[in-house]
Amino acid sequence: MQTIKCVVVGDGAVGKTCLLISYTTNKFPSEYVPTVFDNYAVTVMIGGEPYTLGLFDTAGQEDYDRLRPLSYPQTDVFLVCFSVVSPSSFENVKEKWVPEITHHCQKTPFLLVGTQIDLRDENSTLEKLAKNKQKPITLEQGEKLAKELKAVKYVECSALTQKGLKNVFDEAILAALEPPEPTKKRKCRFL
């Protein structure tokens, strides 16, 4: 059975673990526990063929900046996550996450993933953002940044409601199986 390795990166508390747990178990975790490193595997059928989708969760906190890249070798696709209600996590996509993955894995495709879309219209969230003269990140802003950073695509979801959740992983599988440059194998390799 062919394996697709998908590594999830992004700031702490943007919902990376919830995204993975909700997708693999159909349950939403009730409490926040920072991740050091975790992985999950699911079997998916693509064109009648079974594939193992290996999902690697990583810690977003700075304390793990030296440890995190150890999970990058042999990656087929990255999910670079930010919360649509955390403008700082959106900024860090450009400032930290894409530079980090492209430094280690220059040719590996990545998707830009906006998480927590269920909070985009929630009053208490909007009030908190407004106090700092901020607004949630829009679909258009996500698409614009994805294009600018040469992501395969921008997708967004809610791990809580599961809206858009399956699509995130369907698109990740497509990106891994049909990389934009068919002339080169695009797995991450450390030299």
UniProtKB/Swiss-Prot annotation:
GTP binds at residues 10-17, 57-61, 115-118. SUPFAM superfamilies: P-loop containing nucleoside triphosphate hydrolases. The gene is Cdc42. The modification Cysteine methyl ester is found at C188. This is Cdc42 homolog. The keyword GTP-binding applies. It comes from the Eukaryota. The lineage of its organism: Eukaryota, Metazoa, Ecdysozoa, Arthropoda, Hexapoda. InterPro entries: Cdc42, P-loop_NTPase, Small_GTP-bd, Small_GTPase, Small_GTPase_Rho. GO terms for molecular function: GTP binding; GTPase activity; protein kinase binding. GO terms for cellular component: adherens junction; cytoplasm; plasma membrane. CDD domains: Cdc42 (cd01874).
